[in-house]
Amino acid sequence: MRYHALTCIGSFNTRLLGAVAAAATLLAPVYAHAQSAPMLTKALPADGYYANSYPPGAPFRSWLDMVSASQAAQPNWMTPLVTVTPRLEQEFRYDQYDQKNGTGSQGNGQRLISYGGPGGARVELIPSYDWEVILAPPPYVTASGPKGMAAGFGDWPAFLVKYRLAYGNAEHGDYIVTAFFQMTDALGTDGKISTNVTTAQPTIAFGKGWGDFDIQSTVSVQIPVEALNVPGGPSAQTNIRNFGDPILWNTAFQYHLFKYFWPELEVNYEHWSNGEHVGLTQVLLTPGLILGRFPIGYDTPTRPINLIIGAGYQIAVTANPVTQNNFVGTFRITF
């Protein structure tokens, strides 16, 4: 049974919200065709997206032309390992997490191995000029430790939608500001795999580049909207209350070196003003290296398909953390 924090509605409404948001985003190009085109920094072919809507017989090519123009108008940085980039991306992405939680009073001591990472094995799409939608199945997670052994699907990252507010490529200021909205649905898997709380997460993201160096940052709050009753465990109301409203601030400092090398250092900050971790501030440092973009093919004669790989290691630098350390690996194919 689920308990809704506001009106006691069921989980169907959460899934319906996700479906409506995803459908609206995917249909955005239909609306976009009726609008005047934004100022572009890259010319499009005569049969491109803004020349004549979707030309008969070439809708896929026309859509890719639009995606190319959209990405050419923003900074060309690499997506960090943990911080969600404010850039609009179009790619398949798979992450691997091996996380060890803290053993003090704030942690539960569990080791969680996530196949897909918290975002799941996901597809990121740019359906219209300033929009991105991320869709993913739940990640598969194994757990071991003092809270028991378990395996199953982690909480479902139902959708994440981005809207780009302001931006300029390297020739026009090298900056970007983007708004996100994400819903994550609790699936209730044992072994502390699930939080048992469905959350909404509004985010503001921004970045600035100076030559080969850039900073990308996000600030967000996780808002619990409903929760599960755990058989033999906490009630849904208790799970809502324990979760709190944590504030997350992630920042990546990144440098581009020798064409394919992107070393970075991320600072991952989280603070709980209420809930079971009330008063706790946790900071993780994540040094990492991303390699790419390696061309492995072409969508169109001018749009490459790229391979990206990377790895990093998160480690807590504050006392009594919820998360002690975490190995992060990433594999991506842009298209």
Show the residue positions of the predicted features.
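Transmembrane beta-barrel domains of Gram-negative outer membranes and organellar outer membranes
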Residues: A34-F335
